Curated annotation (Swiss-Prot):
Pathway: Quinol/quinone metabolism; menaquinone biosynthesis; menaquinol from 1,4-dihydroxy-2-naphthoate: step 2/2
Protein name as it appears in the record: Demethylmenaquinone methyltransferase
Protein species of origin: Chlamydia trachomatis serovar L2 (strain ATCC VR-902B / DSM 19102 / 434/Bu)
Keyword terms of this UniProt record: Menaquinone biosynthesis, Methyltransferase, S-adenosyl-L-methionine, Transferase
UniProt xrefs under SUPFAM superfamilies: S-adenosyl-L-methionine-dependent methyltransferases
Length: 229
């Protein structure tokens, strides 16, 4: 399988979540998303200019320039409100901004040595098309780091706890803090419906991106892949 199921109009949904997105995700992950973002940044290593895809409110890009103070970043997201949130909160950050879908990047071929995509893969209706576009803008030998919320293996002792967490805690907390229970029901479903590792890695290979590192976080509730062009 190279495409995920049809997505609702998540651009409008993420626009509506922009004001509370960081706070809610911090609560839902018990603050672990900060450590996970830092792990992604560490595995990617240093470059002068990072391409941050599905950038959201810019947490990965901010972590990147804090860890590598000489770096700058281009943030790409299809949610105007998310990018406006970054600009408003961090006006002096060394960032440029592009409002665009990952499947149609207005960027030249072979431009970036490093790119990141955190919590965005499962929101793509056409991941193969998007990853081929990332391949196009990466330099030969360049790396894409993907951080995604995933499901523990069924034999994992935390599998049932994680399932209960997704079904009960995520929608309830999202509804309480954002007033948008649908959005966090979608989050639950997007994690549940994300293909398992073997299927995802087949998509990576189909896009000519070779997995060179993989790290499971918190019993497999999140996963980092480093892919090479």
């Amino acid at each position: 399988m190279t495409d995920f199921h049809d997505k609702p109009n998540i651009q409008i949904m993420f626009d509506s979540l922009a004001p509370t997105y960081d706070k809610i995700n911090g609560i839902l992950s018990l603050g672990l998303h900060i450590a996970w973002n830092n792990a992604l940044v560490s595995l990617l290593g240093e470059t002068n200019h990072l391409l941050d895809l599905c950038a959201g409110t810019g947490r990965v890009a901010l972590s990147y320039v804090q860890n590598y103070p000489r770096a700058s970043a281009t943030l790409v997201d299809f949610s105007t409100k998310m990018l406006e949130n970054v600009q408003k909160r961090h006006p002096s950050a060394p960032f440029s901004y592009i409002t665009s879908d990952v499947t149609h990047l207005p960027l030249p071929d072979n431009t970036f040595r490093l790119a990141s995509m955190a919590y965005g893969l499962r929101n793509l209706s056409y991941p193969l098309e998007a990853l081929r576009e990332v391949y196009r803008v990466l330099q030969p030998g360049g790396h894409l780091g993907i951080l995604e919320l995933t499901r523990p293996a069924t034999y994992n002792p935390v599998y049932l706890l994680h399932k209960l967490y997704l079904n009960l805690v995520v929608p309830s907390v999202g509804r309480f803090y954002s007033g948008n229970s649908y959005a966090y029901s979608y989050l639950k479903e997007s994690i549940r419906d994300l293909p398992r590792d073997a299927a995802l890695e087949a998509i990576f290979h189909a896009a000519h991106l070779r997995p060179i590192r993989k790290r499971k976080l918190l019993f497999g509730t999140a996963t980092i892949w480093i892919l090479e062009k």
